[in-house]
A protein has these predicted regions:
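Glycine-rich phosphate-binding loop and adjoining helix at the ATP-binding site
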Residues: 123-143, 147, 175-234, 238-242, ...
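Short beta-strand scaffold segments in enzyme catalytic cores
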Residues: 102-107, 228-232, 243-244, 250-256
Length: 485
């Protein structure tokens, strides 16, 4: 979480003059303390608020399972109904495509006794022009990367005659899944605008590209990263029932009984269970929102959507803090008479920045001062730095506690259908994502909310565990447990 040094102000050249800092004069001299007090009041998450969020999450889940479009939560069927058992043997691969890089992973499985014998992975950067090119160009590039990865094995691994290598495909874009190994791309996100893929089966696109490369590989499982995390964690621990990713974005999935999913219309899996991807970022019921949240949402590319994600995930926490500080600067002269225009730049203050400020234990909060100056171009004394840390803590506390309430909502929904099968025994929630992994205060607030909602005794049965990079291995394991051979 290093913070790069940036100049103090945006420089704007004037004709015939040297560039000089552009400043904005504060609008009034209102005291800053009432702004903080009001913010803390609006962001407060006492037990009744947490309970409402958990109850509403469970109700929205139930409505989303009843019928497609029944609630804000899509409750997407993963078609994963065969879970890794530990008996899987052989060589399996995973391909993780979710951003500007893709990752290839090879996993050698040795069955019950040896489990995961070896893993190797490689990361490849996708050239920017391919993010705006054709479907064939993108998938050919990915297949070429897979072929190069396989070539480096140098004949070390041999498959029985007539068998193809099997791959689990983690595809973190909106997909309408139609089976364990097929899914129709709904739309590209995350800066991709590839032509010729929307409405097509992404597994077919990859399989065809691998054939063009002469690669003896085929996709056995298509999963999103949250489902992969659950499968990867469950391989080691049968008590894993829920997986949550808290990173730039957020999602949660869980193990559900197929007989309580009305929209399945009687289709049952062989195991009687499946993994449901909640798509909980779209949840919005009863959240404690502020003017800063509403303004940020209105200015976003998807106003009115993904409200839970905008309140709890790493993409947005730093931006909410920036908006609060800007108001304090303009209305209360927090940083003196003038305001740096850099502070008016959306998303210039990132969640790693506010995390680094909250880790500063020095007497004069030197790191806080340095980050404020380097990132937003403002100077600060100790009292200002303390105020800034209070703002960070207020936003992060709300985010962590709401995420905890969301987890309890999922557990409540599961408990309603399976009395004492969740709260009556050890239940593990597998967590992954940079926000959860790297922000200790966020982690603490999340766990405190879970304990408050469940009570001390019941919360002892709920284990919240970090499952680092579980989605890649999870995809390979799902390829193994759904092997075509």
């Amino acid at each position: 979480m290093s913070v790069s040094a940036v100049g103090s102000f945006w420089l704007s050249p004037s004709p015939g003059k040297l560039p000089r800092p552009r400043m904005v004069v504060r609008s009034s001299a209102v005291s800053v303390a009432p702004i903080l007090t009001h913010l803390q009041k609006q962001c407060a998450t006492p037990l009744p608020v947490l309970r409402h969020v958990a109850d509403a999450m469970a109700a929205d889940m139930r409505a989303g399972l009843a019928v497609d479009g029944g609630s804000d939560l899509k409750m997407i069927l993963s078609y994963v109904d065969t879970f890794p058992t530990g008996n899987e043997k052989g060589l399996f691969y995973a391909l993780d495509l979710g951003g500007t890089n893709f990752r290839v992973l090879r996993v050698q499985l040795g069955g019950k006794d040896e489990r995961v014998i070896a893993t190797e992975f490689e990361q490849v950067t996708i050239p920017q022009e391919l993010m705006f090119g054709t479907s064939e160009e993108l998938f050919d590039f990915i297949a070429c990367g897979l072929a190069n990865f396989a070539k480096k094995e140098g004949g070390k691994f041999h498959l029985p005659s007539g068998r193809k290598r099997e791959i689990g495909f983690t595809f973190s874009f909106p997909v309408k899944q139609t089976s364990i190994d097929s899914g129709i791309l709904m739309k590209w996100t995350k800066g991709f605008a590839v032509s010729g893929t929307a409405g097509r089966d992404v597994v077919a696109c990859l399989n065809e590209a691998m054939e063009r490369q002469g690669l003896d590989m085929q996709v056995s499982a298509l999963v999103n990263d949250t489902v992969g995390t659950l499968a990867g964690a469950r391989y080691w621990d049968d008590d894993v029932m829920v997986a949550v990713i808290l990173g730039t974005g957020t999602n949660a999935c869980y193990v559900e009984r197929t007989d309580v999913i009305p929209k399945l219309q009687g289709q049952m899996s062989s195991s009687g269970r499946t993994i449901i991807s909640t798509e909980w970022g779209a949840f919005s019921n009863g959240l404690p929102l502020t003017e800063f949240d509403r303004d940020m949402d209105a200015a976003s590319i998807n106003p009115g959507e993904q409200i839970f994600e905008k309140t709890i995930s790493g993409m947005y926490l730093g931006e909410i803090v920036r908006r609060v500080l800007l108001k304090m600067a303009e209305a209360g002269a927090l940083f003196g008479e003038y305001v740096s225009e850099k502070l008016s730049t959306p998303f210039i203050l990132r969640t790693p920045d506010i995390c680094a400020m909250q880790q500063d234990n020095s007497d004069h909060l030197d790191a806080v001062g340095a980050i404020l100056y380097d990132v937003t171009g403002v100077k600060s004394d100790l009292s200002v730095r303390k105020m800034v840390v209070e703002v960070c803590d207020t936003i992060v506390k709300r985010g962590g506690r709401l995420a905890g309430a969301g987890i309890v909502g999922i557990l409540q929904k599961m408990e309603e259908d399976s009395k004492d099968l969740i709260f009556g025994k050890r239940t593990v929630v597998a967590m992954d994502g940079g926000l959860y992994e790297n922000y200790p205060q966020y982690r603490r607030y999340l766990k405190e909310a879970v304990t408050e909602l469940l009570g001390l005794e019941m919360s002892k049965n709920v284990v919240i565990e970090h499952s680092k990079d579980g989605s890649g291995i999870g995809a390979a394991l799902l390829a193994a447990s759904n092997s075509k051979y």
